């Protein structure tokens, strides 16, 4: 609708049209950046980044109840315990960044994980080595301003390719297939040596 035609439209409808015009991009950007799509810098969605940051804060080399990790992560993530728990289980099932104990289910059989109060987790040595470096990490205030959280983590490995990613946002979606860990190591070495390489997706469930 052209601006000159707005004169014939009731003021309430004009306000709604302006709200849509002004706020839709803000809403879409929020969903894309804050929930659905991983950041290419570290290959993590916000909930995944907050889980790892929280696990690093409480890390003492011992296993922690998943319920405790979820509660600690809620200091940084405003979207509820269920979203945190689901994301934590999904990362744990990939057996890369999180060392698990108890019944975590199996993506190959469709079995679900036990309740958070019955299973435990801690960071793997691999995660401690390649994900964190406080000297080069930029921080921002958490959603309520009480804490600081990483803008992104200084990951030294192509996590987004190792874990894969899937998400639906406003006006777009992402689906990145997982890749084999050993293949990624070889390709990372090839990149450092400025040599050509070819890599194909891999599937944890054998599909």
PLM feature segments, named:
Residues 1-207:
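Catalytic phosphate-handling regions of large nucleic-acid enzymes and associated NTPases
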